[in-house]
Structure formats: C-alpha cells, structure tokens
C-alpha cells in the first residue's frame, strides 16, 4: 500500500518537488486529512462495481482513495500544471483516467457511456472548487445523468442551503432545484484546518441521492423553476409583489396572478420562503395560462 497523499508532510513534499503554487482563481484547497477522505468514500458507498466521477482532483488525494475501492475513476482537472503531478502520484493505479477539461464544458453523457460501459453503479464524488459549486451541481442535476447520485464537499453555507427546510433562512430557489431532483443530506462538517492552504470558511460534505421521479407533479419544469426564482427574488417582499415584479409581464397580469393564488389557497401576503415544494408546484401549474402564448 502506498503512502497516503493526504497528509501535511506528503502534500508539502509533492508541492515542493513540482514547485507548485496555488491559484486562488481556481479555488484550490487540498485536503490533508486521510480520515475525512475515507469517510467521503464511505458516504458515497463506493464498491468494486462503481464508476466514480471526480471533479478537481488536485494532487490526487481523494482520487487515490476512490481508486482503491472503485472499479474505475474518471477525474476532470482544469489546471494543466497538475497533470504531471497526478501522473506521478497516481501511477500505481491503472483504473484512473484524468481528463484535462473544464467539467462545465464536458459532454458527461458521452464520457459516462464511453468510460463506464462495464459498471453497474455510477457516482460523482468530489471536493468541489468553491467558486463554481452551484453551476457544477446544477449541470449534474439538470442533465439527468445516469448516476446514483453524488457525495460532494463544498462551503458549509452552500451545503446548508441545499439541505434546508421551508421557513428557514437557508431555504431558497437553489434548495428547491436540488431537492426536486435529489434527496439532500449533510453527512458531516469539515473544519477549515484540514486544508492546505486554509480557506476562510468551514466546509461540509453533502450526499445527494437521485430521485427516481420528482416529488411533485408539475406541468412544465421551466415554468415551475421560473415561478420559484421569481418568488425568492427579494426575500423581504410578499409573494404577490415578487410575482408581479419578476414574472414576464407580471404587472399587466395582476388579476390572473391573484386568481391563481386564490385558486390554490395561498395567501398573497406570504413570503416565498414559507412555501414548500408542493405549494410551488400547485402555484406554477395554476400560473401556466400566463406562459401560454
């Protein structure tokens, strides 16, 4: 068994050998605690039948733990300076493929079809770069990839938003988008002290398990998400105010919006954050006539 990458000493040694300096613009913070990495792999339920997709492998600390358990690991790395380091640190593992590409531009359906044809279980496992956490999560969800789900580390504040309940300060349009596609659960909080360099915030690991079908029935997903976003546009405003100001031609359609709210029994004076997903679904279905040209 090779010496783990994720220790302060080994990480420093690897970085010094390659003269690597962190790029703040890429949100590079490397984990230096093997125990936490193993817990992430455990939380993802990685087995010999799993194909794992990793985003931002850094110097390979998590990749190594995944490679020891998964059938195959495909990792997307945007920073070309890390490619020779990964080729070195992961040289003992023949089940790892590094793709030098921005995952936001990748055709993930094609990658999964090509790389994971022989695996029965597919999972995204990653320590996500903080500056692009939300776009990456939304890409993975909206593209409806053939995966079981994802276990990802992110800023604690964002993880709390993904797993939030209605009526709380963290609950918002991102919460609903994520929980429409998955069941969200914060697995653990990770202190900032186990990273190099140390970030300014604590992190959390969240498990998003893909739902076989959405928990609510909506006539049109695009309209549903548009209504949700409009309802949270200004948190201190009432639902009616937000809908009038943020739906297309909302002000001209005040009567229709009021009728729709009345039809589904939602008080127009409520705030968006008090509505649960089922209420948003009924409301967006009732507002469908506004979106028909």
Swiss-Prot record:
Per UniProt, where does S-adenosyl-L-methionine bind? 29, 31, 56, 77, 102, 127
PROSITE patterns assigned to the protein according to its UniProt record, in alphabetical order: RRNA_A_DIMETH, SAM_RNA_A_N6_MT
Check the record and name the Gene3D superfamilies matching this protein.
Ribosomal RNA adenine dimethylase-like, domain 2, Vaccinia Virus protein VP39
Pfam families to which the protein is assigned, alphabetical: RrnaAD
- Provide this UniProt record's keywords sorted from A to Z: Cytoplasm, Methyltransferase, RNA-binding, rRNA processing, S-adenosyl-L-methionine, Transferase
Q: What is the superkingdom listed in this entry's lineage?
A: Bacteria
Can you say where in the cell this protein is located? Cytoplasm
Q: Name one GO molecular function term.
A: 16S rRNA (adenine(1518)-N(6)/adenine(1519)-N(6))-dimethyltransferase activity
Which reaction(s) does its UniProt entry say it catalyses? adenosine(1518)/adenosine(1519) in 16S rRNA + 4 S-adenosyl-L-methionine = N(6)-dimethyladenosine(1518)/N(6)-dimethyladenosine(1519) in 16S rRNA + 4 S-adenosyl-L-homocysteine + 4 H(+)
Which E.C. number(s) belong to this protein?
A: 2.1.1.182
**Keyword Methyltransferase among record annotations:** yes
Q: What is its main location?
A: cytoplasm
Q: Which GO terms describe its cellular component?
A: cytosol
Q: What class of enzyme is it?
A: transferase
What is this protein's function per UniProt? Specifically dimethylates two adjacent adenosines (A1518 and A1519) in the loop of a conserved hairpin near the 3'-end of 16S rRNA in the 30S particle. May play a critical role in biogenesis of 30S subunits.
The UniProt similarity line reads: Belongs to the class I-like SAM-binding methyltransferase superfamily. rRNA adenine N(6)-methyltransferase family. RsmA subfamily.
- What is the name listed in the Swiss-Prot or TrEMBL entry for this protein? Ribosomal RNA small subunit methyltransferase A
Its source organism is Geobacillus thermodenitrificans (strain NG80-2)
Please state the gene responsible for encoding this protein: rsmA
């Amino acid at each position: 068994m090779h010496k783990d990458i994720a220790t302060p000493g080994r990480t420093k040694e690897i970085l010094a050998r390659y003269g690597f300096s962190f790029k703040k613009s890429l949100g590079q913070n490397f984990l230096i605690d093997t125990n936490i990495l193993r817990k992430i792999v455990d939380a993802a339920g990685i087995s010999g039948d799993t194909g794992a997709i990793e985003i931002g492998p850094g110097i390979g600390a998590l990749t190594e733990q995944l490679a020891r358990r998964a059938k195959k690991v495909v990792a997307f790395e945007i920073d070309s300076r890390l490619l020779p380091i990964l080729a070195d640190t992961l040289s003992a593992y023949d089940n790892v493929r590094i793709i030098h590409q921005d995952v936001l531009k990748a055709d993930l359906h094609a990658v999964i079809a090509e790389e994971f044809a022989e695996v029965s279980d597919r999972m995204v496992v990653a320590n996500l770069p903080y500056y692009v956490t939300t776009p990456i999560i939304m890409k993975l969800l909206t593209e409806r990839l053939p995966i079981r789900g994802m276990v990802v580390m992110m800023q604690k504040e964002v993880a709390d938003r993904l797993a939030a309940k209605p009526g709380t300060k963290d609950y918002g349009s991102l919460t609903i988008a994520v929980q429409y596609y998955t069941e969200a659960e914060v697995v653990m909080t990770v202190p900032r002290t186990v990273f190099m360099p140390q970030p300014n915030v604590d992190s959390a690991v969240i498990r998003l398990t893909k739902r076989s079908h959405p928990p609510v029935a909506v006539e049109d997903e695009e309209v549903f998400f548009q209504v949700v976003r409009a309802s949270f546009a200004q948190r201190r405003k009432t639902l009616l105010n937000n809908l009038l100001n943020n739906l297309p031609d909302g002000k001209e359609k005040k009567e229709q919006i009021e009728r729709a709210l009345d039809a589904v029994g939602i008080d127009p004076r409520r705030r968006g954050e008090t509505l649960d997903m089922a209420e948003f679904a009924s409301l967006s279905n009732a507002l469908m006539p506004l979106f028909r040209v």
